[in-house]
Amino acid sequence: MEVILEIPNVLHEEKHCEDFLDCVEIYMKYLTKYGKQLGICYGQNSLKKFPISGEFRNECENGYVEIVK
């Protein structure tokens, strides 16, 4: 699993995580640390698609943070 942070034309980071709880910790750190750059976030699954188990995406004005398998 990994956590992806994407702020177009500014920053792209991917961090590997061993388990879901480890991923959630990294996910929350990204949202906290880069909150100002990301702008207003719309929450998980803003595209109204059914989420795949273990995948979470937080869409924001200026990018996103996502957990993927």
From Swiss-Prot:
**Superkingdom field:** Viruses
Q: What is this protein called?
A: Uncharacterized protein 9
Q: Per the UniProt entry, what species is this protein from, by scientific name?
A: Sulfolobus islandicus filamentous virus (isolate Iceland/Hveragerdi)
Its organism's taxonomic lineage begins at: Viruses, Adnaviria, Zilligvirae, Taleaviricota, Tokiviricetes
